[in-house]
């Protein structure tokens, strides 16, 4: 062990100018004299023990030969840090106040060329930036110009993610100001391709990864996340990403994209958002054989092993972040999605966007479409192609709204809704073989195996596609819908675009321009007989950002179905006669933050009414309160 005197001598030598030059005046790149090397060896030993006092002497004190060899490497590399090995690590120091070079690489505080002259002097930025000082608006204009040069959507996505990693406020300012143009870039449909290629385009981790390797240590993994005041978590296990299937760990693009929209559209602070991927393996052989795959290379865990990890995760979230953190389940396979929602809805603040979010936005579209086609919700007949999470979730919310309006039992209201899965129409004769979540939708009817036969037999006024299978709304099907409906309501909801049941152009052309159409993925306006039809997009982004904000500002501890109905009814009221005349049953996204504030106010009001809110007293004007709580991405001035 070094004596206290020797340690002090070594520390003083480290601060001396002789540290950087030999006695003979040699430069710092040279090896220096023997005595200087000895001083450096002793100073290095002091630093090692200061950083890790419990290290054994054999690690702290290196042999002279080893040290001399490392000094040669350090001299060539240009610094003491190059002397580090696995046995003698360096400490990754971080400063409490970012300045200079560090500040420019901090995405939470970086402003690029928008740093003022005063800020450049105060934070040691002078010379690290070109002389020009520009506004945030000009930065937005420049980036939009650059993005429009890319012809491939994935290139735009990568450029946007790169911006988010460099300058967080500029990213959200860009997205908010150009939401209609950039929404398809940061989310569907482009995010689907990004997830498929996530391993290849992976640059920097975003979010938190919890894998089977972390079993028994999930609490510690969550503690590694730097933020503590988390309000919204979006979590996926990657088994059913959009309509693309099992993408394993590469499904992280979905939670990242969703939470970007929570901030941009709903105003939830970025630091309060946490994207998480639960990696339990993948059954996708292509990914397992892909050298760039970033997840566990094993078959997907199921049963007890899977549910034990999820139980540990849910318990850890509640322990660290409390019971008022909203946990949004995203893109879980049917068999897990329904089980997880049923299991945790009574003990946690949970929300499944594929089941509940999709249902809420589609119900809003249906309520809005009634202003075009006439009648009440109970007077229409509904046929779904697809009986998974989305299909059954929408069907249940329709039945709940009908029950609310008519005061009829929910079982009676379900009879207005028919579902068709891969084996045909869901009828009573199939009840024994049906999964539990499909059984409420089995009605008395003869077996029907094809969609066209079901349409001709049931004669629905509303046809909704949630199958994930493209081109299933054929010309014959849409012509049949148009033959007995003056204004057939056709929702082609599957994502991405390639999986859509039909395109907007097909729906309008095959119905002679009479269809009331909405889709899950965006479509361009369609001209038919001289009239421009603007297809509405039944995008969950209308609902979940405002819904989440409403939960946050009310301090709700549980999600109730009446809160979903309140969100639907509020969104339905936002579409105007001008929108209807253009053919759209949804309002434009240009006003989405105002819409989100109104939805948040409705959701919060319902939470207070149901006794689920904990943030007391209740604000007098919930809409104004919601707006005041929303994150704005304008630059802040620095001292």
From Swiss-Prot:
Binding-site list for NAD(+): 240, 354, 495
Pathway: Photosynthesis; C4 acid pathway
Binding site for NADP(+): 383-399
Site annotation Important for activity: residues: 354
Xref: SUPFAM superfamilies: Aminoacid dehydrogenase-like, N-terminal domain, NAD(P)-binding Rossmann-fold domains
Main location: plastid
Highest taxon listed in the record's lineage: Eukaryota
Cofactor annotation: Mg(2+); Mn(2+)
Transmembrane segments: none
Subcellular compartments: Plastid, Chloroplast
Active site: 187, 258
GO cellular component, one term: chloroplast
GO molecular function, one term: malate dehydrogenase (decarboxylating) (NADP+) activity
UniProt xrefs under NCBIfam families: PRK13529.1
Function: The chloroplastic ME isoform decarboxylates malate shuttled from neighboring mesophyll cells. The CO(2) released is then refixed by ribulose-bisphosphate carboxylase. This pathway eliminates the photorespiratory loss of CO(2) that occurs in most plants.
Name by which UniProt lists this protein: NADP-dependent malic enzyme, chloroplastic
Source species: Oryza sativa subsp. japonica (Rice)
């Amino acid at each position: 062990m070094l004596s206290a005197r020797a340690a002090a001598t070594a520390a003083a030598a480290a601060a001396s100018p002789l540290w950087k030059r030999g006695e003979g005046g040699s430069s710092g790149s040279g090896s220096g004299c023997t005595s200087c090397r000895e001083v450096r060896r002793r100073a290095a030993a002091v630093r090692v023990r200061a950083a890790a006092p419990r290290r054994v002497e054999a690690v702290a004190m290196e042999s002279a030969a080893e040290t001399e060899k490392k000094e040669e490497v350090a001299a060539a590399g240009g610094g003491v840090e190059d002397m580090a090995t696995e046995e003698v690590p360096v400490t990754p120091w971080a400063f409490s106040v970012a300045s200079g070079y560090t500040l420019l690489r901090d995405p939470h505080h970086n402003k690029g060329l928008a740093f003022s002259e005063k800020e450049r002097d105060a934070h040691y930025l002078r010379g690290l930036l070109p002389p020009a000082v520009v506004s945030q608006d000009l930065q937005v204009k420049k980036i939009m110009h650059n993005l429009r040069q890319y012809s491939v959507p994935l290139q735009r996505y990568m450029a946007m993610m790169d911006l988010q990693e460099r300058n967080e406020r500029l990213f959200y300012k860009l997205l908010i100001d150009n939401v209609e143009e950039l929404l398809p870039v940061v989310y569907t449909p482009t995010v689907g391709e990004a997830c498929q290629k996530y391993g290849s385009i992976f640059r920097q981790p975003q979010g938190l990864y919890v894998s089977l390797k972390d079993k028994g240590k999930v609490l510690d993994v969550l503690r590694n996340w730097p933020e503590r005041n988390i309000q919204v978590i979006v979590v996926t296990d990657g088994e059913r990403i959009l309509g693309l299937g099992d993408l394993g760990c590469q499904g992280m693009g979905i939670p990242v994209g969703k939470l970007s929209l929570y901030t941009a559209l709903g105003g939830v602070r970025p630091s309060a958002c946490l994207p998480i991927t639960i990696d339990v393996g993948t059954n996708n052989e292509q990914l397992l054989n892909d050298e760039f795959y970033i997840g566990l290379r094993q078959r997907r865990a199921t049963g007890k092993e899977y549910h034990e990890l999820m139980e540990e995760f849910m318990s850890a979230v509640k322990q660290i972040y409390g019971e008022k953190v909203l946990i949004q389940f995203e893109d879980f396979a049917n068999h897990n999605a329904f089980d997880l929602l049923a299991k945790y809805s009574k003990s946690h603040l949970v929300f499944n966007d594929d089941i509940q979010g999709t249902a809420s936005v589609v119900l809003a579209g249906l309520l809005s479409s009634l202003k075009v086609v006439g009648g009440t919700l109970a007077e229409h007949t509904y046929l779904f192609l697809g009986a998974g999470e989305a299909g059954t979730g929408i069907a249940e919310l329709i039945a709940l709204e009908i029950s609310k309006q008519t005061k009829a039992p929910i079982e009676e209201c379900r009879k207005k809704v028919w579902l068709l899965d891969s084996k045909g129409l869901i009828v009573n004769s199939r009840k024994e073989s049906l999964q539990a979540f499909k059984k409420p939708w089995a009605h008395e009817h003869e077996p029907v195996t094809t969609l066209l036969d079901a349409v001709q037999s049931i004669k629905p006024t509303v046809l909704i596609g949630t199958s994930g299978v493209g081109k299933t709304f054929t010309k014959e099907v849409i012509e049949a819908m148009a033959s007995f409906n003056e204004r057939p309501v056709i929702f082609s909801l599957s994502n991405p675009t390639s999986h859509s049941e039909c395109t907007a152009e097909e729906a309008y052309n095959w119905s002679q321009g009479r269809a009331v159409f909405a889709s899950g993925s965006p479509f361009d306006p369609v001209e038919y007989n001289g009239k421009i039809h603007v297809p509405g997009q039944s995008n969950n982004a209308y609902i979940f950002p405002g819904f989440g904000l409403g939960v946050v500002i009310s301090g709700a501890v549980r999600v109730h179905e009446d809160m979903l109905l309140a969100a639907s009814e509020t969104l339905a009221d936002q579409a105007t006669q001008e929108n209807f005349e253009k053919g759209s049953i949804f309002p434009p996204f240009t006003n989405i933050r105002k819409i989100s504030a109104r939805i948040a106010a409705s959701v919060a009001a319902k939470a207070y009414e149901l006794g689920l809110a904990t943030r007391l007293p209740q604000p007098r004007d919930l809409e104004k309160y919601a707006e005041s709580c929303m994150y704005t991405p304008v630059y802040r001035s620095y001292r």
